[in-house]
Amino acid sequence: MYLWLKLLAFSLALLGPEVFVTGQGTTDDGLDTTEIVLLPQTDPLPARTTEFTPPSISERGNGSSETTYLPGFSSTLMPHLTPQPDSQTPSARGADTQTLSSQADLTTLTAAPSGETDPPGVPEESTVPETFPGGTPILARNSTAPSPTHTSNVSTTDISSGANLTTPAPSTLGFASNTTTSTEIATPQTKPSCDEKFGNVTVRYIYDDSSKNFNANLEGDKKPKCEYTDCEKELKNLPECSQKNVTLSNGSCTPDKIINLDVPPGTHNFNLTNCTPDIEANTSICLEWKIKNKFTCDIQKISYNFRCTPEMKTFALDKHGTLWLHNLTVRTNYTCAAEVLYNNVILLKQDRRVQTDFGTPEMLPHVQCKNSTNSTTLVSWAEPASKHHGYILCYKKTPSEKCENLANDVNSFEVKNLRPYTEYTVSLFAYVIGRVQRNGPAKDCNFRTKAARPGKVNGMKTSRASDNSINVTCNSPYEINGPEARYILEVKSGGSLVKTFNQSTCKFVVDNLYYSTDYEFLVYFYNGEYLGDPEIKPQSTSYNSKALIIFLVFLIIVTSIALLVVLYKIYDLRKKRSSNLDEQQELVERDEEKQLINVDPIHSDLLLETYKRKIADEGRLFLAEFQSIPRVFSKFPIKDARKSQNQNKNRYVDILPYDYNRVELSEINGDAGSTYINASYIDGFKEPRKYIAAQGPRDETVDDFWKMIWEQKATVIVMVTRCEEGNRNKCAEYWPCMEEGTRTFRDVVVTINDHKRCPDYIIQKLSIAHKKEKATGREVTHIQFTSWPDHGVPEDPHLLLKLRRRVNAFSNFFSGPIVVHCSAGVGRTGTYIGIDAMLESLEAEGKVDVYGYVVNLRRQRCLMVQVEAQYILIHQALVEYNQFGETEVNLSELHSCLQNLKKRDPPSDPSPLEAEYQRLPSYRSWRTQHIGNQEENKKKNRSSNVVPYDFNRVPLKHELEMSKESEAESDESSDEDSDSEETSKYINASFVMSYWKPEMMIAAQGPLKETIGDFWQMIFQRKVKVIVMLTELMSGDQEVCAQYWGEGKQTYGDMEVMLKDTNKSSAYILRAFELRHSKRKEPRTVYQYQCTTWKGEELPAEPKDLVTLIQNIKQKLPKSGSEGMKYHKHASILVHCRDGSQQTGLFCALFNLLESAETEDVVDVFQVVKSLRKARPGMVGSFEQYQFLYDIMASIYPTQNGQVKKANSQDKIEFHNEVDGAKQDANCVQPADPLNKAQEDSKEVGASEPASGSEEPEHSANGPMSPALTPSS
C-alpha cells in the first residue's frame, strides 16, 4: 500500500500543478463575455519594433483574405490594460487535479495548431501577444519555473453595448498516466499574477474592406495556441471608434487580466488639403486635415503633427489640424510631412510638396511720353529687373480710363485715338501671373495732345428781338480741341455778307436789319488755332408793325366804302330783274363775262414771287381768281347732251359737253343718237383741238369710246383715274388684259401687246383695227396715271411733270388729238391739260396766263379745273419746272450728260452739276417738329439737328391691339386711326417713300440703350422684313448705336427677340431674328444686314459692296409693284445709321435710283434727293454724296455703241470727283427757306348730282385739298 501511494505521488509530481486548470473568467452581470482558450507557443517572439508593414493574414481554413488597415506606414499602439481580480482562487495544489467540465460558447475563429510542445525540463509561461492596431508584435515574458500543460481562458466584453461573450475552459482534460505509484501528496503552491503572465500581449487591428469594420487579433511573444478546436483568438466586425473589454484568464495565474480595446477610426475619414488663399500664396502656406462630416469618434483623441523642410521644424497641432506658415521665400519649394495621431499614436502620414507663388514685380525704372500729335503719343520704358510676364499701360482723362495689355518683349507703345488738346496721364506697370495676377507699382507720365479743328456749335437758336433785330444764341461745340473759345457770327442776305461779329460768348443781338427780309446767320467757333465749320440758321425779319397799323386803318375805311357800293349794286340788280326768260338769259350771259377779273400773265422770272404772294394768307388771291371764273358758260347750248336718247350716256347729269365743240361720231343706220359721246375738243397753246377731254367710259359707252379713238386717229390715251376709288366706280375697264389678249368693241378690235407697271403710272401698248375698213391697224399707247389720291391732289407736282414727259415721248406731229379722261372728264383732265399747255407757253414765250387759259377751258367744257386746289396745282407745277427744269436722264445718255454736267465753263464758275446741287431745297423747318422737340422726347434724339417731322414720323402704339380677326386680315386694315399723336409713343424715325410709293421705308437713328425696346416694337408693329445697319456701334470712345441684339433670347415687354442665325461675308454680316409677341401666335422672321465696309465716312470705301448689299436685300423683300394707293404705313425695310440721315440718306437714294433704272431705264438724282430731304432733315447733305450718286449709277450702267450695258456687281466701280474742297466751299450756296404749305381745306364750287344712284360727281371725290408746295432754293 505504501508503495502504491508512493507511485501515485510520484506520478502527480511529474504531471505538475498545472495539469488541471480550473480558470473560468467571470464578468460583471449583464456583460456578454467570450473566452478564448489559447496554448502557449514554444518558440520565443522577436523583440518589439516601432516600424512594421501591415500583413495580409489568413488564419481561416476557408482562405478568406483580410487586409491590414493602415496602408503605407506602420506604428504600434500600446494597449490600454486594466487588471481585474480573478473570481476563482484555488486554496490548495490538489485543486488543480480536479476534473472540470465546462460548455464552451465560442465565436467562429480559426484555432492555432496544437502540435508544438515545450522542451522537457524547461518550465514555460503562457503569453498572449497583442498587436494594436496593425499587427506589430510586443515581446512576451518567459518564466523559468516548470509548468505543466495548461489552458488559458480569454473573455471579451463590449463596453459600449454591454454584451458579454465567454469562452470557458473545457470541463474534461486528458492527462498522462504513470505506472509508478506514490503516496506523496503534492503541497499547494502560490499562483503568479496574470498581469505578469500576459504582460506582452498585443492587439492587431485589421480593416476589412467588405464589411467596413475592423478585426482584432491577440498576439504576444509566442504565437498563442488553442488547446481545443473551438478556441478563439480573433474578434471580427468591430465598428470603428467602438470599445470592448478583453479578459485573459488562465488557471496558472490569478487574478484575470482585462484589456480595454479602443478601435481606431479609418483613414478614409481624413483628407489633407491645401488651404492657402491665392492672394497669399507667394509668402504663405496653409495645410489642413479635413475630417468627414459623419465622423463619430472622440475628436479629443485626434492630434496632428507637421514637419516642413527646408526649415525642418515640427509643429504639433490641436484638434483643428490647420498649419499656417508665413513670411516664406517666393517661388520656393517646401515639403511638409503631415501626421494624424490617435491616442498619440500615428494613424496616417502623408507628404505634401508645395511651391510658393511669384512675387510682385518692381516699379519700372523709367517711363517717357513723347512725340505727341493731336490724337497719338509714343510711350517708352525700361525693363524692370524683377520677374514679370508683361505690362499693362493705362491712359486716362477724367473720368474715363482705357488700358492695354502688352507683351513682355516690348518697350514702347503708340497710344492712338486720343482727343485733341486734352491732358492725359499714362500709368505703366509690370505684372506677373501665377495663381493670381500680381501687379507691380505704376510709373506715371503726363502729356497733352495738340490742338485740332473744333466741331460745330450746338443748340443754335435764332429769334426776333423786334421787327428788324434778331437774337442769336448757341452753346459751345462738343469738341473744342483748343486753348481758346471765340464765336464768330456772319450775317448774310442773298449770298452777300451783311455783318460780322466776334466775341467770347455766343449771345448776339443783330439789329438795324431790313424789314421783311430773309437772312442767313452763320456761327463759327474759333479755338485759338483752328476755325470750325459754321452752323447755319435762316431767319427773316418782320414787317414794320407801325406802318401796318396805318395801313389797317386805311383798309377799314376802304372796305366800308366798298361794302356800301356792293349793297347798292345788289339792290339795283334786284330792281331791274325782268320776268322775261330771254331777257334773264341775256342778263346772265352778260354777268358771266362781267364777273371775270383782269389777271396779268406771269413772266418766268416773277413766277415764284407771284406764287408766294398769291398763296399767302391761306391762298386768298388764288381763291378770288378761281371763284371769278364761271363754272358753266350758259351762252353755249348743251341741247344734244340733254336729249333723251343720250342721257344714259352721261356719267353725271350736270357735266355735259357744249354742242358747238362736242366730238361727233359717224351715224349708224340713220340713228341720230349714235353720233353722241360725252367728249369735247380742247385747244392747246396756239394749237386748235390738240386734246379731247372725255368722261370715263361707262359700260354702255365703251364701244362709242373706241369708235371715237378710231375715227379721230388718236394714238395716245391719258387716263387720270383708277377704275375704282374709295369703293366707287370711276371708269369701266375698257381694254383687254394680258391674259385675254384681244377684245372686240362693236367694229373695233383691240389687242394688247405690252403691259408695263411703274410706281405712278401703267403703260400699255395696244393695237386697234376696224372690221369694215381696209385701212391698216394703228398702235395706241394707253397711259394710266395711278398716283392721284382719292381726295385732293397729288402732293408732289413733279409727278404730273413726269407724266407729261412720258405722254410727249409717245405723241408725234402726225398723231390725232391726245385723248385725256378721268371720271367726269373735267377736274383732273382739265388740270393735266392746263399744265401741258402752260408749260408750252412758258417754253415758247417765257410767260404764262393760267387764269386766261382756264377761262378758255371753261368756255370749251364746263367745270374744267374743277376745284381751287387743282387751280393752285397748275401754278405749283409751273414753279417746279421753272425752278428746277428737267433733271431726268435716260440711262443711254447718262455718261455724256454727266460729262457735260462736270464741265466748268469758264473754269472759275461752278459746274452745271454743282449748280444743280445748289438748286436743291434744304427744306429746313418746312414742317413742324413739335413731338420730337418736346422736353420728355429730347433725350431720345442722338442729334438735335435730326428730329423727325410730325407729319411722317413713325408713331408707336402703347399696347398692341389684338384683333379677333386673322393676322392676314389685320394686315389689310389701316393703322392711321391708331397713329394719332395723342396716343402714340415717340421714336426718332421717319417714313420715307420708296420708289414703289405705297411701299414705304423707315429711316431711323441708331437706337439708344433706353430705346431698344421701342426700336423692336416699331419693327414688329410696322411689319419690317429687313433691317439695314450702316454704322458701327462705337466711333472712337463714343457710342453711335446701342447693340440692340444679343446671344440667345432677349425680352422687351411683350416682345421676345431670338437670334437664330449669323452669316458673315466680306461686305456685311447677315443675322436672322425671330420675333414673338405674347399676344400673337405666329412668330416673324426679320433679317439684319450690317454693313461692315462703311466705317462712318461720308462715302463708302467700296461702292460695289453697297450695290451688292442692295441686291441681296431685295431678295428678302416682298415683290414690289402693288397697284393702288392704299396707305398702310407699313414698311418692308428699315435703314439706320448714327443719326438716321447721313449714311441712311445716301443708301435710300441709291436704293430708289437702282429701282428706277431697272424699271424705267431712267435716273433722276435731283428729284430722288429732293424727295428724301422733304421726308427727313439732313438727307444727302453734301455735294460729294450727290455727285457719288451720279458716278455710281454711271458705273453700274455703262454704255457701249449707244446701248446700255448693265455692269455686274463685281465689276470695278470708279469715281471721278472733279470738285476740290476749296472750290466746293465757294460754290455750294445754302438754299433759302422753303415756303409754308397752303392750308388743306378749301371749299369746292357748286355741286353735281350723279346720273345714277351708284355714282357720284367727280368733284365730290376730288374735293379741295392743300397743294403740296415746292419750296425754292
Swiss-Prot record:
Tissue specificity field: Isoform 1 and isoform 2 are found in thymocyte and lymph node. Isoform 4 and isoform 3 are found in the lymph nod.
Keyword Transit peptide: no
Enzyme Commission number(s) from the entry: 3.1.3.48
InterPro entries (UniProt xref): FN3_dom (IPR003961), FN3_sf (IPR036116), Ig-like_fold (IPR013783), Prot-tyrosine_phosphatase-like (IPR029021), Protein-Tyr_Phosphatase (IPR050348), PTP_cat (IPR000242), PTP_recept_N (IPR024739), Ptprc (IPR016335)
Domain Fibronectin type-III: 361-452, 453-545
Reactions that this protein is recorded to catalyse: O-phospho-L-tyrosyl-[protein] + H2O = L-tyrosyl-[protein] + phosphate
SMART domains on file: FN3, PTPc, PTPc_motif
Record's bilayer topology term: Single-pass type I membrane protein
GO molecular function, one term: protein kinase regulator activity
Disulfide bond positions: none
Name of the featured protein: Receptor-type tyrosine-protein phosphatase C
Organism: Rattus norvegicus
